[in-house]
Amino acid sequence: MDAVVLSIGTELIDGHLTDTNATFLARELAALGIPLRWVAQVGDDLDWIVRMLRRAWEDASLIVTTGGIGPTEDDLTREAIAQLLAEPLTIDPALLEEIRAFFAARGLTMPERNAKQASRIPSCEPLPNPIGTAPGWFVRRDGHIIVTMPGVPREMMRMWHEQAVPRLLPSIGGGAIRFRTLKTIGLGESLVEERIHDLIATSRARIATYAKDDGVHVRITAHAPDAGAAERLLDEVERALRARLGSAVYGTDDTTLGGAILELLGRSGWTLAITEWASGSRLTSLLAEEPAAGQFLRTATILTSQPPLDSSLEEVARDLAQRTAVAAGSDCGLAIIVRIDPGPTADRSVGQAALAVSTPATVVTRTHQITSHPQEIRRRVGLWAAEFLRLALLEASIQESTATSA
């Protein structure tokens, strides 16, 4: 089996959206061992979509499409596949009722134009979409498979994992495939790969690294005769990866960086107060987005003025972290101070950052210097602060636990 990925939508070819779906699917197909022949984007034009589908039909046995299955007149993927295969397109009453129920569950009435999303051809098996109104298609015809999914990334990814992959497995040798992602922070992608390169080369599972906004993710793909064997292989590889990456690993799969920090606070029974000074409040935003933030985050103070030139930022941060904790009546205090001075160009601004964490066990500080655009400086400092806070909390909780047991 080989594959073609076709991303459909005018917004992809006029520069308004980046085709992240194709990148995701390329990685997923590689993990399944399915060679990808080519990837293309095409606008919302019926003739062009049919033309690209015909080419894909000639070049590969698996065609994966995303986009073009919404409710509007320019959503034409269903019509194009029907034309390609010369099959009639009709409304499926059961699908229509599911779409009506989706709206009703949210206290809404389904707009009539959404009825077209319930259309299907005879060779199509509908793919459920529990988080959207657009069912996908799984089509088997003349030795080919067409998988049609929404263009919304979160809908597409869930449909791919829960609906498409299980249906594809019998065609690629059967068995079970399971995935797990280890999330790391504080190590660059090249350093992560350096630490685990032999595991990548020798493991029975596929291991790949991806640089993300919240650190470097290590994706494990386990293909085994059954689900139990696949899970055991995931566990085995995860243990080996954790042994190499150590405390840089902050979670797996759905774990967020903010959630990992709050979990450490909860484990110790501590609360936190934050002062961010000219830093863009990146870390405060990261924590505030978490459902459990209110349990552990006492206060967050945002200062927007430029820090003074005539002071040591590290000493100011140390003092500020302690005073922040005392003022809020919290167990821990965090201070983030950023000073950005102009460079020869905006992209060469000089940023200095001082971080300090006060815990019941100790006060620790760290400084950074970076030359970049001010927005990038603040983004990087936010990640550094998250990593620094997490490690400080981890170390402090270990110290307290050791002292208590002694």
From Swiss-Prot:
InterPro entries: CinA (IPR050101), CinA-like_C (IPR036653), CinA_C (IPR008136), CinA_KH (IPR041424), Competence-induced_CinA (IPR008135), MoaB/Mog-like_dom_sf (IPR036425), MoaB/Mog_dom (IPR001453)
Taxonomic superkingdom: Bacteria
NCBIfam families for the chain: cinA_nterm (TIGR00200)
Family, similarity comment: Belongs to the CinA family.
Protein name per UniProt: CinA-like protein
Native source species: Thermomicrobium roseum (strain ATCC 27502 / DSM 5159 / P-2)
